[in-house]
Swiss-Prot record:
Signal sequence extent: none
Top EC class for this record: transferase
SUPFAM superfamilies according to UniProt: PLP-dependent transferases
Protein's recorded name: Phosphoserine aminotransferase
Organism from which the protein derives: Lactobacillus helveticus (strain DPC 4571)
Recorded name of the encoding gene: serC
Note on how the cofactor is bound: Binds 1 pyridoxal phosphate per subunit.
Transferase among keywords: yes
Length: 373
């Protein structure tokens, strides 16, 4: 039985990458040493990290005035790092509240003494559509505007970025990093954990414009952008294996036609599932169609008990980790870059058959009930 992993992260990795890791694990490049034990100060790792940076630059067309950095601590770590490094002039930021992770980013900035102005929120609409800019803003008021480009839990995404005037735009791209195309130059800073689209858990990519990298007092060294630029992301021991594995995924991504190629596939995958859900009489997705995510698709029936049955039976069929986030319930299918089209087709086939069987069972019960009247 083929197993497909629909987890929100850590997520599925490309089969060729897993195979290469297996082959190289005992002895990396014939060195007699595993990637798990090589020194981060070795020439071998210098090549690994520099190649990964160059491949990110190539894939995302990163301009020369941006730095590519590797951190630990996930996107959550950057919720603290970004305001510490960037909110230094006004100590005030703007935020569009599109869901759980945007809220977490705002809370962390506020915890650090930064004033957070939530310009718009769709919380009252259960985050089933995106918030938008209610008015123009200025860099004379704000250090930056924070957005979450893809909302992993709620299933929405900014396919077109909000207008932000001369205010620096900070994007949390954690769950659609390299899953669809964005212009890096539209942002002052991009960050994202790689464990959804680009690699295993353990490394966070930060892409930051050079003019935003400044000396800041009273900031932990482990979150200091200036220090990480100077040390080529090796102020301390970096996550060697995670960077190595991410590098392999980047090579694989180039072979898929780059981000444009993988975005086309992601659109095809998501359309396959959305088309089924829109025609279904049992399952439904309540997200505004123009705001739907390519990578995270929540859906449910009208009965939480039935949702649990779907999840359990899907698991038995090899369709793993479809349980929705605890804050919204239901089911969620995460269709990250390495999820093959065949996996989505298998899910749709399963849901179709489940719905058909459910209808038959329901009609049978009604028939028996009517005979007893």
């Amino acid at each position: 039985m083929t197993v497909y992993n629909f987890a929100a992260g850590p997520a599925t990795l490309p089969d060729p990458v897993i195979k290469q890791i297996q082959e190289e694990l005992p002895s990396l490049q014939g060195s007699g040493m595993s990637i798990l034990e090589i020194s981060h100060r070795s020439q071998m790792f210098d090549k690994i990290i520099d190649t990964a940076k160059q491949d990110i630059k190539d894939l995302m067309h990163v301009p020369d005035n941006y730095h590519i950095l590797f951190f630990q601590g996930g996107g959550t770590g950057q919720f603290a790092a970004v305001p510490m490094n960037l909110a230094t002039k006004h100590k005030r930021i703007a935020l569009l509240d599109s869901g759980h992770w945007a809220t977490r980013a705002g809370d962390e900035a506020a915890n650090l003494g930064v004033t957070v102005d939530v310009l718009d929120s769709t919380k009252d609409k259960h985050y089933q559509e995106l918030p938008h800019m209610p008015h123009a803003i200025s860099a004379s008021d704000y250090d930056y505007l924070h957005i979450t480009t893809n909302n992993t839990i709620e299933g929405t995404a900014y396919h077109t970025l909000p207008e932000h005037g001369d205010v620096t735009l900070v994007g949390d791209l954690s769950s659609n990093f390299m899953a669809e195309e964005y212009q890096v130059s539209d942002f002052g800073l991009i960050f994202g954990g790689v464990q959804k689209n680009l690699g295993p858990a353990g490394v966070t990519v930060v892409i930051v414009r050079d003019d935003l990298v400044n000396h800041v007092d009273h900031i932990p060294s482990i979150l200091n952008y200036e220090l990480f630029v100077k040390k080529n992301s090796m102020f301390n021991t970096p996550p060697v294996f995670a960077i190595y594995a991410t590098g392999l995924v980047l090579k694989w991504l180039k072979q898929q036609g780059g981000i444009a190629g993988i975005e086309a596939l992601n659109k095809k995958k998501s359309a396959l599932l959305y088309d089924f859900l829109d025609q279904s009489t049992l399952f439904h997705n309540d997200i505004k169609k123009t705001d739907r995510s390519l990578t995270n698709i929540p859906f449910k029936t009208t009965d939480p008990v039935l949702d649990k049955q779907v999840i359990a039976e899907a698991d038995q069929a090899g369709l793993k980790n479809l349980k929705g986030h605890r804050s919204v319930g239901g089911l969620r299918a995460s269709l990250y870059n390495a999820m093959p089209l065949a996996g989505v087709q298998a899910l749709v086939d399963f849901l179709y058959n489940f719905e058909k069987q459910h209808k038959n069972n329901t009609m049978g019960k009604r028939y028996v009930s009517s005979k007893n009247i």
